[in-house]
């Protein structure tokens, strides 16, 4: 009897998360391809069954922030091959009134040659800059406990990711210096397992 009540309560709570997100002013996640060749994206909520997006050079994929059904974050998996292997992940989680974001290279870093950057539309929020030619970006997750790589901004802030931001066949892009953020204000990685 108690388990049925708990299941009903959790189901109702899970249904409220997307509704709560719809009620506020939410920003947009944008991923721009500056690599000079096609790149492949998968915007993942609950499962890896989402459709592959082929992003041609110069194109941008945009999506308004959303949540998965358990209230967790979204992972936009980014690759240079359509086989869903060797991926970088742009991850965001809306937790009113903020959006938390990071770049994860735990499952590969196919953009090491050209680099990756994340520039929030709110200039007071920290940028993430992984310069081209660097095999391990210190501003990204390279190990599961690299929590220094998670940043937060107001939830209405757009997050602009540029793939091959530091080069590629499309040439170098303007690089921005990231704003330093106090370590005490950083949350744990939004997709991390509990300790």
Swiss-Prot record:
Question: Which Pfam families would you find in this protein's record?
Answer: Bys1
Q: Which UniProt keywords apply?
A: Disulfide bond, Secreted, Signal
**Which cysteines form disulfides?**
125-153, 130-137
- Location of the region described as Disordered in the Swiss-Prot/TrEMBL record: 171-195
Q: Where is the composition biased (Basic residues)?
A: 185-195
Q: Does the keyword Disulfide bond apply?
A: yes
Sorted alphabetically, the Gene Ontology cellular component annotations on this record are: extracellular region
Report the locations given in the UniProt record: Secreted
Q: Where is the signal peptide?
A: 1-22
Q: What does this protein do?
A: Might be involved in the inhibition of growth of fungal competitors and pathogenicity.
What family is this? Answer: Belongs to the thaumatin family.
What is the protein name stated in its UniProt record? Antigenic thaumatin-like protein ARB_01183
Native source organism of the sequence:
Arthroderma benhamiae (strain ATCC MYA-4681 / CBS 112371) (Trichophyton mentagrophytes)
């Amino acid at each position: 009897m108690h388990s049925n009540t708990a299941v009903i309560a959790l189901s109702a709570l899970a249904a409220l998360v997307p509704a709560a997100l719809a009620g506020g002013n939410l920003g947009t996640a944008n991923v721009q391809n500056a690599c000079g060749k096609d790149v492949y994206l998968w915007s993942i909520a609950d499962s890896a069954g989402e459709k592959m997006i082929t992003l041609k050079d110069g194109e941008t994929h945009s999506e308004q922030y959303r949540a998965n059904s358990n209230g967790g974050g979204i992972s936009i998996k980014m690759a240079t091959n359509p086989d869903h292997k060797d991926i970088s992940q742009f991850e965001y989680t809306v937790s009113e009134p903020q959006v938390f974001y990071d770049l994860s290279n735990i499952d590969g870093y196919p953009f090491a040659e050209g680099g990756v950057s994340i520039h929030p539309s709110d200039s007071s929020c920290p940028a993430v800059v992984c310069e081209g030619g660097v095999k391990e970006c210190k501003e990204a997750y390279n190990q599961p406990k690299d929590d220094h790589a998670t940043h937060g901004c107001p939830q209405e802030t757009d997050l602009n990711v540029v793939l091959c931001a530091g080069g590629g066949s499309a040439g170098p892009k303007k690089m921005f210096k990231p704003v330093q953020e106090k370590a005490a204000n950083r949350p744990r990685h939004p997709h991390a397992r509990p300790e």
